[in-house]
C-alpha cells in the first residue's frame, strides 16, 4: 500500500509540475542569449584565428604550476614511509626547478601582459 501511495504521489507531482511549466509565460529569446560563447571566440567563425603569444606563455605557466600542485598533493601520504629523505628532497627539487623557471620568466618579462 505504501509503494502504491508513493507512486501515486510521484505521478501527481510530476503531472502538476509539467502542466505548470506549460502554463507559465515563455521568456523572450534574444539572439545574444541563444548564441554560444566560447572564451571570447565566436564558434561559427574560422578556427584559425591567431592569439597573442603572451596569452600562450601565461597559459603554459599556469598548466605547469597546476601540474606542480598535482605532484605535491600526495606528499603527506608519502611521508608515512621510512624513506622520508628521498620524498622531501624530490619535492624540494621540484619546487626549486619551478621557482627558478618562474624567476627566469619574470626577469625576461614573460609574465607582463602589456608592454
From Swiss-Prot:
InterPro entries: NADH_UbQ/plastoQ_OxRdtase_su3, NDAH_ubi_oxred_su3_sf. Signal peptide: none annotated. The chain crosses the membrane at residues 4-24, 55-75, 87-107. It catalyses: a ubiquinone + NADH + 5 H(+)(in) = a ubiquinol + NAD(+) + 4 H(+)(out). Its main location: mitochondrion. Its EC number is 7.1.1.2. It is a multi-pass membrane protein. Core subunit of the mitochondrial membrane respiratory chain NADH dehydrogenase (Complex I) which catalyzes electron transfer from NADH through the respiratory chain, using ubiquinone as an electron acceptor. Essential for the catalytic activity of complex I. This is NADH-ubiquinone oxidoreductase chain 3. It comes from Calomys callosus. The gene is MT-ND3.
Amino acid at each position: 500500500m505504501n509503494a502504491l501511495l508513493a507512486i501515486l504521489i510521484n505521478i501527481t507531482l510530476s503531472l502538476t509540475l509539467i502542466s505548470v511549466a506549460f502554463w507559465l509565460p515563455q521568456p523572450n529569446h534574444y539572439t545574444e542569449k541563444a548564441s554560444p560563447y566560447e572564451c571570447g571566440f565566436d564558434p561559427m567563425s574560422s578556427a584559425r584565428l591567431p592569439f597573442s603569444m603572451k596569452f600562450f606563455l601565461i597559459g603554459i605557466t599556469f598548466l605547469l604550476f597546476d601540474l606542480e600542485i598535482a605532484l605535491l598533493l600526495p606528499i603527506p601520504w608519502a611521508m608515512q614511509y621510512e624513506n622520508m629523505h628521498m620524498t622531501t628532497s624530490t619535492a624540494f627539487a621540484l619546487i626549486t626547478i619551478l621557482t627558478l623557471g618562474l624567476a627566469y620568466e619574470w626577469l625576461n618579462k614573460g609574465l607582463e601582459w602589456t608592454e
